């Protein structure tokens, strides 16, 4: 039994089963057993899960990215600005937002890899900078379909098709498109980590950076790639967030990094780097998603949910240290 508990996947599954058992016990008069509850949980956790995909790559390199929430907010505002106000085609707006997110991530990675700035400091600076960019390009206001005319009245623009698509449900309204995007991001990360040379580089850099350097691994390029991909996934999440809210809010995404980090840590990816996987992050997303949903259907307030999430992060980190 002890040997099995040494497996991160087993421990993550035990945590998920425990949370599901709580849901079955405190089922809010049967609400937990309805498919709508599970569908809505998947839709809610998908944006956080997409952020956690990028964070998983960064944390395996022994880094951290505190800017994911702000980059989500920046790209959501940029997407709304390009689509709702400038009325650009989705074929131009989507790639532009994805490139902007990836570029911001590469800047963080470059500061860390080339200038030896601590990941905490570099991404903290990017967190503040990206929030500032979101407020700057939006003028501090939400970008919605309501457009102010010179005479003081409002004109309501049509919702772009890409917004409607990202906010839709398929298969008889049973699966949200954003959930499928989350699963696609999981698949992309799995391919990177399991099938590509750069995935092995990411593990090598996180396991022992100096040994990786002496073995010929391009350490700086690997770190820039990991943070660039994190920024890319932030942009994907930003597009989904803007479509779900039908607006670009410069304040959106605040504290999202807390939930995304919790998903990665609870899944079992080691904060010290070198160990972990995207499958564990998926289990962590399900655990956090179900935990929040169970608290929600049982009318536990937001304050209680936030405090519980913080306590779970501390518990997961202490458990990792105990295992050593």
Language-model regions, residue ranges each:
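N-terminal, non-cleaved signal-anchor transmembrane helix
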Residues: 1-44, 170
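Hydrophobic core segments of alpha-helical transmembrane domains in multi-pass membrane transport
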Residues: 12-25, 55, 128-134, 179-191, ...
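Single transmembrane alpha-helix segments in multi-pass membrane proteins
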Residues: 20-26, 34-86, 110-117, 262-278, ...
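Transmembrane helix-bundle core of multi-pass membrane transporters
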Residues: 120-196, 222-225, 245-250, 300
